[in-house]
Amino acid sequence: MKLKVSFRNVSKQYQLYEKQSDKIKGLFFPNKDKGFFAVRNVSFDVYEGETIGFVGINGSGKSTMSNLLAKIIPPTSGEIEMNGQPSLIAISAGLNNALTGRDNIRLKCLMMGLTNKEIDEMYDSIVEFAEIGEFINQPVKSYSSGMKSRLGFAISVHIDPDILIIDEALSVGDQTFYDKCVDRITEFKNQGKTIFFVSHSIGQIEKICDRVAWIDNGELRMFDDTKTVVKEYKEFISWFKKLSKKEKDKYKKEQLASRKQVLSEEDLAHLEKDKNKQKSLANIIPIAGLSILVVLAAGAMFV
């Protein structure tokens, strides 16, 4: 099978700040005592056609993994090899709240490299799949979380990505829409596409995924076939639920403390590199956004 995604010793670190002034200081004088691992030393290989589930309690690092896979954030250290174009589906991911659903469809498709002609050809199908009716002409800021998820999912599956990352996007819809999404995911699986599926629903994980990665405290605790991992994870959840509130708080506090670590010079260098990338993006994004809005405006003149 063809290798689609490979993580090698991937970590994502952030610096923690207690107040805004500390963040400003950190731009010039990084604090070595405020390092936090969102994800630490993760390695795995995923092959073409596989559907991989991510499980873990809140704050374990699942969404950070989604953002790394979608190339939204770079790793602090380690290497990520990706043979294909990823697309992230999460509540509100990639949607502009100030624009209407109609404009968001065009904007997101343009950003993914589609032409206006291609967008026009698939527009009606996207709107039909999203099932949000006349709200398609309303600003996204007026949408419920479920409506945002519907629109985001509809756009992403019509763009036809090589690698699909679904982060809790099916947790807010009704059963009918959920069934339709699962059918589309099954179609993608049959086409040999690679899918990453993040969910708190063990039932969804069992139904959809071939293998499961259990993320615990920012680390990859287990990565195996679905049945094996789900069995172990269920036992952990059963144990965790039996803890008192005080015991749960203590457990979470200990886990959080273990993810804080003094930053090495190499770590600080990686963080500085991330900041420089963010500054570059900050300069590029307004220009790109303006260019796309000009295209939208020009297109509107001929509608």
UniProtKB/Swiss-Prot annotation:
Enzyme Commission number(s) from the entry: 7.5.2.4
SUPFAM superfamilies assigned to the protein according to its UniProt record, in alphabetical order: P-loop containing nucleoside triphosphate hydrolases
Positions of transmembrane segments: none
Record field: catalytic activity: ATP + H2O + teichoic acidSide 1 = ADP + phosphate + teichoic acidSide 2
A GO cellular component entry from the record: plasma membrane
CDD domains noted in UniProt: ABC_KpsT_Wzt
Subunit structure as annotated in this protein's UniProt entry: The complex is composed of two ATP-binding proteins (TagH) and two transmembrane proteins (TagG).
Protein task: Part of the ABC transporter complex TagGH involved in teichoic acids export. Responsible for energy coupling to the transport system.
Name of the protein described by the UniProt record: Teichoic acids export ATP-binding protein TagH
Protein species of origin: Bacillus licheniformis (strain ATCC 14580 / DSM 13 / JCM 2505 / CCUG 7422 / NBRC 12200 / NCIMB 9375 / NCTC 10341 / NRRL NRS-1264 / Gibson 46)
Name of encoding gene: tagH
